[in-house]
C-alpha cells in the first residue's frame, strides 16, 4: 500500500493529529501519530502488520519483541503473521526489562517491532536487552518512522510510513514560545512543559 493511502487511513481514523504535543521522547511536535486509533480496527491492523511481516518473512525470525505499551499490539500481530512467539519488554523503575516469565535464548533471531519511532530510544533499549541475552537482532520494524529514515537502529530496518515530522527540544519549541497549549498523549506519563 502506498504511503498516501496509508496516511489517508490514519487521517480517516483520527490517528494523525495536528496541534502541540509532548512526545514520549520528551521532544515537542506539531503532529502526533496515535497508532492505537488506527490499530483498533482489525482490518487496518492486519494490513499494516502484513507489510512489516512480509518484509521480514525470509529473515529467519524466531521471536518478535516489542516495547510496551504501543508496540505490543503491532508486535503480536506481526508475530502471528510470521508464525513465531511474541513477547514484550516493559519499564520497571524507569528501565526497560524483560519480565512476566518471558525470556530469550542464546542465538535466537529476534525482530524488534514498535508502533512509532521518533528518536529510537525505546527500540535501542529493547535491542540492548536482546543482545544482553545473547540473542541476535534480526531487524527493526515499525508502523511510523517520524525521522524519515534518519534514525538507523539496525542494518535491516523497515517502516510502513516514513515521514519527516517537525519536532523540537522542549527548550526551543516555537509552539511553547507562542503559548500554544500542549498535550501529552503518549503511553509514558509526561509532565507539562515549564514553558507551556
From Swiss-Prot:
Decide whether keyword Nucleotide-binding is in the record. Answer: no
| Gene3D superfamilies linked to this entry | 3.40.50.2020
> Which cysteine-cysteine pairs are annotated as disulfide bonds in the entry?
none
GO BP, one annotated term: 'de novo' UMP biosynthetic process
Known function: Catalyzes the transfer of a ribosyl phosphate group from 5-phosphoribose 1-diphosphate to orotate, leading to the formation of orotidine monophosphate (OMP).
Could you say which protein family the record assigns here?
A: Belongs to the purine/pyrimidine phosphoribosyltransferase family. PyrE subfamily.
This one is known as: Orotate phosphoribosyltransferase
The gene that this protein is the product of is pyrE
Amino acid at each position: 500500500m502506498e504511503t498516501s493511502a496509508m496516511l489517508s487511513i490514519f487521517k480517516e481514523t483520527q490517528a494523525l493529529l495536528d496541534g502541540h504535543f509532548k512526545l514520549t521522547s520528551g521532544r515537542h511536535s506539531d503532529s502526533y501519530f496515535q497508532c492505537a486509533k488506527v490499530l483498533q480496527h482489525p482490518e487496518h491492523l492486519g494490513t499494516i502488520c502484513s507489510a512489516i511481516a512480509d518484509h521480514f518473512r525470509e529473515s529467519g525470525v524466531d521471536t518478535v519483541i516489542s516495547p510496551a505499551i504501543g508496540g505490543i499490539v503491532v508486535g503480536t500481530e506481526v508475530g502471528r503473521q510470521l508464525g513465531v512467539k511474541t513477547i514484550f519488554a516493559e519499564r520497571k523503575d524507569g528501565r526497560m526489562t524483560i519480565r512476566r516469565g518471558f525470556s530469550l535464548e542464546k542465538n535466537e533471531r529476534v525482530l524488534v517491532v514498535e508502533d512509532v519511532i521518533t528518536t529510537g530510544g525505546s527500540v535501542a533499549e529493547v535491542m540492548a536487552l536482546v543482545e544482553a541475552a545473547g540473542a541476535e537482532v534480526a531487524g527493526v520494524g515499525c508502523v511510523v518512522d517520524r525521522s524519515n529514515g534518519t534514525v538507523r537502529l539496525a542494518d535491516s530496518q523497515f517502516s510502513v510510513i516514513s515521514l519527516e515530522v517537525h519536532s523540537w527540544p522542549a527548550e526551543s519549541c516555537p509552539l511553547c514560545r507562542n503559548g500554544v497549549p500542549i498535550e501529552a498523549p503518549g503511553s509514558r506519563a509526561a509532565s507539562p512543559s515549564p514553558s507551556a
